């Protein structure tokens, strides 16, 4: 801005001298120079827009054809909004750290401010809160200011708008959105520290494209690196989304340890309490009735949401798998019906007739197929940090998860089910496994955590009951790591015993109801709490509705374990090992392929050993184990109970 003012001053000064000289010579009256308005279109703006591809939307963007520089023209109104900036991998030459479709960094909540010379990008803090009408608000605001993440020089003006050059931010290796993982010094202690490292190659990097829409801007850039110490090239196409967050905030719901939701912690500063109030709010989608249906909803009628949750399924999935992936997605409608909504979750193929569709665009939630050797799937979601509202979500489906599903089904049920005694399952068997895996990951995208204690609520003997298993499957929650029925014995399948998890468990339906049902007359999270507590109290006596948190750093509570079934791991393990002995006796016969190497036999032998080891590990936590329970004041029970001596001796 100083340069612009200085140039204007010099221009006026020189012009006045020229006109004075002419006046003396020609004796003509000198006219006053035209005043240049501060916010008028200037020469710098014309320079920026010349030969640029101009797109209008959230901001007007200019991508110059020659230099490939990217400019944002930011209207004055934009400085009153809050935004989310996401950073996703669109393509990669190396899947060591990321696969295509995966978020490379956590989304950043940002806002913009400006002065006479610069536009500042601030990182907005949301973990501390205050009511702006509280007397302490002014002091709070001074002590929790939003730090500046980046400053951009104003290079031009257009009336009330300012123009900034964002080329280096989106086309360079900006640390806060770099595809090179930033690791903490403690990473190696927890199995990390092996991420790719490299030197940015600016000459092999570029901004590829920009798309601008009313509420978002989508930018693709090619970033290249030379990795160390092997000196290998590494290139990624990154997709950045700048998305304006809603001005009307979603109603927040307080988290409760007795129902497993992902959540965000906040600290409430207030002058009405004697301390800072810690609060935790669940992550959930904004599922609300249409205004005209609100009365019907509170009368108990099923209504459609104002905005459904739509998942687009990658057409890279083989058709025979894509169909059941979509079924697994829409299985969750049963749970939302319990909360009073119908047709909440929809599954569609990637659209072929929408030129604006991009699976990396923040507006679209997608199930993406990643052709890698990783044997896994994951379902991350991305929230408005202010409220916990889930804005978008993805399921990353790694190609080799198929081998994981195959191996589980073989080692857990081959002793009782002759359909899985082969290297390649029939379509109907694999489709059942895929549907379960898809539904599990969608559960995460809806806000649900793993419920590792769910399967412990089932008596071991019940898992050999046709009536019980046909009704409940292997677990009351598909958010548990409770796979296939390894407790069933030869002959049980023919009697009608079910070998697989349910489409949804009773806990899953209950949890969605608890998290998404609207409560009439409760206009604050605190007013909801009494009703939410009553819903939990109603189910308290039934262990099927208990939540067991995942134990990450070692298993202390034997009732909250992964890959387990039933309420007696010793008895369940004995039955399971009987089945493993049957499999070992027939392994070569069931995997026989004349003329083939023994690779498949060896692989399945390893899988049997792994399954055997799981059963041993399920018993180990009983020795010195503690059962934890979420207890509230006034309840006649203990928060922790040591495993009794007799059970510990039996486990040994």
Regions found by a protein language model. Give the residues of each.
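Extended catalytic-interface subdomain
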Residues: 378, 383, 389-397, 435-446, ...
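Zn2+-dependent metallopeptidase catalytic core
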Residues: 79, 318-344
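Conserved catalytic/binding loops enriched for acidic/polar residues
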Residues: 455-652
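Stable alpha-helical elements in mature extracytoplasmic
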Residues: 321, 325-328, 430, 434, ...
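The catalytic-center signature of Zn2+-dependent metalloproteases
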Residues: 349-370, 432-489
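Sec-exported extracytoplasmic/periplasmic mature domains
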Residues: 330-341, 443-444, 448, 484, ...
């Amino acid at each position: 801005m100083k340069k612009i003012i200085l140039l204007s001053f010099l221009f006026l000064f020189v012009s006045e001298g020229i006109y004075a000289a002419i006046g003396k010579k020609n004796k003509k009256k000198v006219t006053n120079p035209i005043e240049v308005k501060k916010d008028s279109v200037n020469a710098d703006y014309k320079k920026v827009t010349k030969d640029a591809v101009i797109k209008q939307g959230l901001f007007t963007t200019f991508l110059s054809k020659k230099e490939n520089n990217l400019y944002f023209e930011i209207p004055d109104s934009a400085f009153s909004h809050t935004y989310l900036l996401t950073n996703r991998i669109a393509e990669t030459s190396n899947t060591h750290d990321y696969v295509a479709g995966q978020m490379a960094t956590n989304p950043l909540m940002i806002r913009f401010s400006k002065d006479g010379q610069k536009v500042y990008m601030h990182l907005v803090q949301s973990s501390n809160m205050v009511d702006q009408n509280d007397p302490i608000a002014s002091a709070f605001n001074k002590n929790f200011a939003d730090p500046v993440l980046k400053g951009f020089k104003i290079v031009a003006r257009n009336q009330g708008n300012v123009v900034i050059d964002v080329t280096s931010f989106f086309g360079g290796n900006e640390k806060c959105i770099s595809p090179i993982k930033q690791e903490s010094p403690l990473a190696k202690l927890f199995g990390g520290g092996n991420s790719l490292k490299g030197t940015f190659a600016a000459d092999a990097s570029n901004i590829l494209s920009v798309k601008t829409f009313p509420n978002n801007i989508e930018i693709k850039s090619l970033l290249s690196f030379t990795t160390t110490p092997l000196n290998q090239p590494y290139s990624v196409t990154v997709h950045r989304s700048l998305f304006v967050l809603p001005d009307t905030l979603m109603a927040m719901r307080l988290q409760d340890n007795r129902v497993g939701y992902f959540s965000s912690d906040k600290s409430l500063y207030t002058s009405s309490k004697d301390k800072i109030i810690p609060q935790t709010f669940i992550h959930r989608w904004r599922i609300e009735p249409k205004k005209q249906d609100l009365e019907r909803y509170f009368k108990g009628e099923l209504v459609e949401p104002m905005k459904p949750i739509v998942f687009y399924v990658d057409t890279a999935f083989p058709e025979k798998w894509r169909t059941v992936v979509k079924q697994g997605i829409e299985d969750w409608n049963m749970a939302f019906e319990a909360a009073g909504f119908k047709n909440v979750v929809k599954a569609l193929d990637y659209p072929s007739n929408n030129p604006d569709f991009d699976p990396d665009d923040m507006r679209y939630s997608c199930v993406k197929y990643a052709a890698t050797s990783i044997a896994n799937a994951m379902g991350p979601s991305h929230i408005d940090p202010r409220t916990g509202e889930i804005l978008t979500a993805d399921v990353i489906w790694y190609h080799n998860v198929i081998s994981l599903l195959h191996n589980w089904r073989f080692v857990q049920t081959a002793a009782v089910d002759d359909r899985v005694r082969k290297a390649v399952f029939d379509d109907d068997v694999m489709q059942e496994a895929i549907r379960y895996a898809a539904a599990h990951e969608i559960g995460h995208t809806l806000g649900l955590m793993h419920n590792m204690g769910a399967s412990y609520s089932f008596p071991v003997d019940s898992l050999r009951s046709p009536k019980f298993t046909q009704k409940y499957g292997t677990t009351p929650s598909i958010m548990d790591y409770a796979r296939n029925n390894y407790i069933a014995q030869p002959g049980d399948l023919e009697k009608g015993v079910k070998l697989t998890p349910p489409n949804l468990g009773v806990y899953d339906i209950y949890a969605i109801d608890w998290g998404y049902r609207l409560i009439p007359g409760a206009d604050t999270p605190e007013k909801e709490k009494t009703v939410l507590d009553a819903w939990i109290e109603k189910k308290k006596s039934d262990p099927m509705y208990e939540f067991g948190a995942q134990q990450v750093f070692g298993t202390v509570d034997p009732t909250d374990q992964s890959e387990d079934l039933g309420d007696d791991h010793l008895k369940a393990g004995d039955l399971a090992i009987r089945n493993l002995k049957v499999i070992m006796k027939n392994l070569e016969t069931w995997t026989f392929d004349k003329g083939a190497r023994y690779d498949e036999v060896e692989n399945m032998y390893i899988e049997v050993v792994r399954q055997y080891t799981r059963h041993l590990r399920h018993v180990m936590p009983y020795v010195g184990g503690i059962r934890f329970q979420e207890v509230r004041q006034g309840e006649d029970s203990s928060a922790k109970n040591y495993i009794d001596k007799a059970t510990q001796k039996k486990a040994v």
